[in-house]
Design a protein with these regions (language model features):
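A short helix-to-beta-strand connector/capping loop
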Residues: 28-36, 49, 136, 162-165
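Active-site HxH/HxHxD metal-binding segment of metal-dependent hydrolases
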Residues: 1-29
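Divalent metal-coordination and catalytic microenvironments
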Residues: 11, 53, 67, 81, ...
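Structural beta-sheet core signal
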Residues: 1, 77-78, 140-142
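Fold-independent oxyanion-binding glycine-rich loops
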Residues: 4-5, 80-82, 104
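Cap/insert and terminal regions of metallo-dependent hydrolase folds
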Residues: 84-173
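Hydrophobic pocket-lining residues within nucleotide cofactor-binding pockets
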Residues: 6, 58, 145
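Core dinuclear metal-dependent hydrolase active-site scaffold
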Residues: 32, 36-89, 173-177
């Protein structure tokens, strides 16, 4: 399992602690565990399973990150939980983005909550997308919409008349790019 050091520490303390679950980082033997926790930092570039990825900055209330994976058609980007994020925009500037998966947790009536919790609402999403200067043909998928918010969030995004196609990810659906 690869993750930020803070996330891996939380897994050690709260999950793999022999209270909730056994410590699989030491089982069946300390020298041959089932599970290895491997830290990474924002900005790290890794090759995992033949796929080149980069760990991206996120702006959230707890340690978080995004991921970009290089593909033959460009970069597939997942923002993770994030609010407005100048560091992410700078990191992505000039890259050919094949697809962007970006969180949009709350509707615009709950924008204040989105700001406090460092998430996005539709109008905040629009600001981020326009500042990214993406090719209008880049597919934009929203994710992390809070329960009961999907109709309001997608309706508000549609009303923004953005120059790119924005759609909500659907559970169980497979996407190719």
């Amino acid at each position: 399992v690869h993750g930020l050091p803070e996330t891996l520490d939380a897994l050690r303390r709260h999950i793999f602690n022999n209270v909730i679950w056994p410590d699989f980082t030491r089982l069946p033997h300390a020298d041959r565990p089932i599970l290895e926790l491997v830290p990474f930092q924002v900005g790290d570039r890794l090759t995992l399973g033949g796929l080149r990825i980069e760990i991206l900055p996120a702006w959230h209330t707890v340690p978080a990150c995004g991921v970009a994976a290089e593909t033959p058609s460009g970069w597939w980007v997942f923002t993770g939980d994030t609010g407005p994020n100048p560091a992410l925009r700078e990191c992505l500037r000039g890259r050919p983005i094949a697809q962007l998966v970006i969180e949009t947790a709350f509707n615009d009536e709950e924008r204040a909550l989105a700001e406090i919790s460092r998430h996005l609402s539709p109008s905040m999403l629009a600001q981020e997308l326009l500042q990214l200067d993406l090719d209008p043909n880049t597919p934009i998928a929203i994710t992390h919409v809070k329960p009961g918010e999907m109709a309001a969030v997608t309706g508000q995004i549609a009303a923004l008349d953005l120059p790119m196609t924005v759609f909500a990810l659907t559970r169980g659906e497979r996407y190719r790019f």
